[in-house]
């Protein structure tokens, strides 16, 4: 870690490192995302993966347009395009939304959670000028991507994809998302 830390320090002084237990792996992904959001200092929180790349040159200038209010209220969830059918995988969430609801997500399906909440609250904005490539094994069949992180998603002993998806669809979590959307709408109204 020291080598990576030194590299980051040379690159920028605006980073934080968070060490935490692995927990249940994919089943606890939302816990890690929420922990990172709590210490983030930026205006937007960007849900991202280590197997993804933004391919649009100048994408940060496009986000700056949203930040400056050129496309409506900057307090929004901005969705970007990618190379597969699910178009809500890498949202940028305004920090006020996180602060208003007190979390990014309460389920490992962070992208789906915030998409449903933002859509219902009327604060979701599509930004298809920004393109990303997601090199996930089940999308690209790239054998080097069939690693421990990928296989952990399907591990039912640790609350893998199917268990967390069932929880996501439960009445309890649906009600929480409805409450999240209402909190956001009330915050936007002032």
Model feature map: region roles:
Residues 1-23:
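Acidic donor-binding segment of Leloir-type glycosyltransferases
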Residues 19-29, 53, 83-84:
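Short, acidic/glycine-rich phosphate-metal binding loop used to engage nucleotide
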Residues 31-44:
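Active-site nucleotide-sugar/metal-binding loop of Leloir-type enzymes
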Residues 42-53:
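Short beta-strand-to-loop acidic/aromatic patch adjacent to the donor-nucleotide binding site
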Residues 57-77:
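Conserved donor-nucleotide/metal-binding helix-loop-beta segment in metal-dependent transferases, i.e.
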Residues 74-90:
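Short beta-strand-to-loop element that shapes/binds the nucleotide-sugar donor at the catalytic cleft/hinge
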Residues 93-110, 117-126:
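Aromatic-glycine-rich donor-binding/catalytic loop that engages nucleotide-sugar donors
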Residues 112-190:
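C-terminal catalytic/acceptor-binding lobe
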């Amino acid at each position: 870690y020291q080598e990576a830390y030194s590299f980051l320090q040379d690159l920028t002084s605006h980073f934080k490192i968070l060490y935490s237990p692995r927990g249940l792996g994919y089943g606890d992904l939302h816990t890690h995302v929420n922990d990172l959001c709590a210490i983030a200092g930026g205006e937007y929180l960007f849900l991202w993966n280590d197997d993804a790349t933004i391919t649009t040159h100048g994408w940060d200038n496009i986000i700056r347009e949203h930040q400056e209010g050129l496309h409506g209220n900057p307090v929004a969830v901005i969705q970007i395009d990618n190379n597969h059918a699910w178009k809500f995988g890498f949202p940028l969430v305004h920090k006020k939304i996180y602060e208003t609801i007190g979390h990014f997500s309460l389920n490992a399906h962070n992208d789906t959670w915030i998409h449903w909440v933002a859509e219902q609250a009327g604060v979701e904005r599509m930004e298809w000028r920004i393109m990303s490539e997601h090199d996930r094994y089940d999308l690209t069949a790239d054998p080097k991507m069939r690693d421990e992180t990928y296989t952990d998603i399907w591990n039912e002993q640790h609350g893998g994809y199917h268990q967390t998806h069932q929880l996501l669809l439960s009445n309890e979590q649906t009600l929480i998302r409805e409450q999240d959307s209402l909190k956001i709408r009330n915050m936007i109204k002032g």
